[in-house]
Structures are given as C-alpha cells and as structure tokens.
Amino acid sequence: IGAEYMHISDPVEKKWFRERMEKKENQLHFTSSGKKSILNKLIQAESFEKFLAVKFVGTKRFGIDGGESLIPSLEQIIKRGGQLGVKEVKIGMPHRGRLNVLANLLQKSYKRIFNEFVGDYSSAKDSTGDVKYHLGASSNREFDGNLVHISLTDNPSHLEAVNPVVLGQTRAKQFFHKDIKRQKVIPVLIHGDAAFAGQGVVAECFAMSGLKGHNTGGTIHIIVNNQIGFTTSPRFARSSPYPSDIAKMVEAPILHVNADDPEAVVHCARIATEFRQKFNRDVVIDMICYRRFGHNEGDEPSFTQPMMYEKIRQHPTTLN
C-alpha cells in the first residue's frame, strides 16, 4: 500500500491518516473468518467470469478478470459503513466488472443474468432494449445485524456520465432521510484509469464536491487501474504519473494498492470508509491491476500490446 496524504492542508486530517497508515495497532490484520470471507468472494468472482467464458464463448461481458479484488473491497465498504451508521450505498460504475458486481454484491439471480445472455426475457418490462452490462439493480444486505440498502445505477456506454447522476441521487436520498450530517447515504464511484484521468466530468464533480448546494458528504472513489484504456497505454493517455492525480484538486487522500493482494485492498476500503465517515470528504483508492483479456471478449489484445499480454498470460490469477 502506498498513501498520498501530504497534500492535505488540514493538520487533523493529515494526522489521522498518518496514524491510520503507520501505527502498529492499525496495521493490516484479519481474523481467520475475515480471511475466509475475502477468499469466498474471490472464488465467487473468478468462478463467475470463468463460467461465462466457457458457457458464452466470445460474448461481450466486460469481465473483471485481473481485478477480482474489487468484489471483496466493495463488500468491506458496505460492512464497515453499516457499522458506522450507513443505511444506503449508491454505486456508479462503468461496464467493466458490472455483471460480477450485480451477481456477487447485489445478489441479482444468476438465472436473470444468463437469460440476458441468451436473449430470453421474462417480461416486456425487463429493460429489453438495453445491453446486460448497462443495467442496474438494488438489494438489501445485512452485515453484523446492520441492514444496508445498495443500489447500482443504470448507465449508458458513455464513461463517467453516471457520476453526477449518482451524486444527485445521493443528495436527494440524504434530503429524504433528513440526513443533515450526510452519514446515512454514501456514494461509491468506480472508474477506469483512462476515464478517470481523461473525462472532464470527473473534474467537474470534484469541483462541486465541497459546494453547499451540491455536497454529498464525500465520495469513495475506486479506480480499477488495469493500466490500459481500450488499446491506449498510460503514457499516451495522461500527462500525470497516476490516474488519481486529478483528485488532489480537492486534497483527497489517495491509496495506491496492489490488486493481487486482496487483503491489502480490503484494508484500504476500510480506511477509505472510515475517513469518509469521519471527515465527510472524498477519498480515492487506486487499485492497480491488469486486464486479462481484450477490451471485450471478442478482442485480441496482443495485436496492440504484445509484450504486456505475454506477461499477463504467464501471470497467475489473484486466487492462485
């Protein structure tokens, strides 16, 4: 784990973050059951993608292969959030990994997801005009006796366009919950590395994040940094060292973490949730991973990134 927090001007926030990262009692530590639940989520995530790859060969699904640690980290945000008073989590994300999140986090039935693959819909109301990796869902999850409502917002193909929608929904929900402290409803936005650095709407949302009329009490951002945007390498996609550098405009702390260490990713998710609930400010997790297959499952990535994909082919999965 690498942390960027020295750009924060508030000494209280800076001290909290330093102690949260460096104090011995705050170090990475999981109980046996905690480790098992992380492993369980990784098995679910990887098995889901492998099943789809075998059953629906070459069909677009925009799998999370290589970034499976996203699933246990989202689970941790909901679990820790529930302990800290969160009643509702609003999630916005692109198509990469969406089906996995629907199945393994929101517990959308496998039957409905597979029906969407074969084009068999049970009713005319089933959003039949849209592709399966644009659809949202909502469900209730219970952890440690805390019931948390999770909803994943529908989105178009336009990357990051869902961000202001999620923030607006969050703000509205806080109004209806009479959530003046902005502790009961939290937004979680998941991004790709190229889109986070490249799309102007990201900067616009940061610019409005502290304004009285638009503030949602802080967003947890997770960048699924697979080090490639369609076929574009990072050095051709941005001028800054990290995709997360845009977040420094609002002095958001940034956690860089290796996605092949799922315990570290979950630890970062815990820190991010605690920071957001304590200081009501944005926080960013830069989850550095890779994309095992092409941009979609019909692409051959080694045409444009031969050396990268030679290494990826030899690289074991997170589970292995």
Model regions and ranges:
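Acidic, metal-coordinating catalytic cores used for nucleic-acid/nucleotide bond scission
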Residues: 196, 262-264, 291
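Active-site proximal loops enriched in glycine and acidic residues that flank catalytic Cys/His/Asp
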Residues: 93, 191-192, 223-226, 258-261, ...
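Conserved thiamine diphosphate
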Residues: 242-268, 310, 315-320
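Conserved internal helical-beta-strand scaffold that buttresses enzyme catalytic cores
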Residues: 1-201, 206-219, 225-235, 239, ...
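Glycine/aspartate-rich loop-and-adjacent alpha/beta segment that forms the canonical ThDP
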Residues: 1, 109, 278-320
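Hydrophobic/aromatic ligand-binding patch that stacks against planar heteroaromatic rings
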Residues: 211, 246, 275
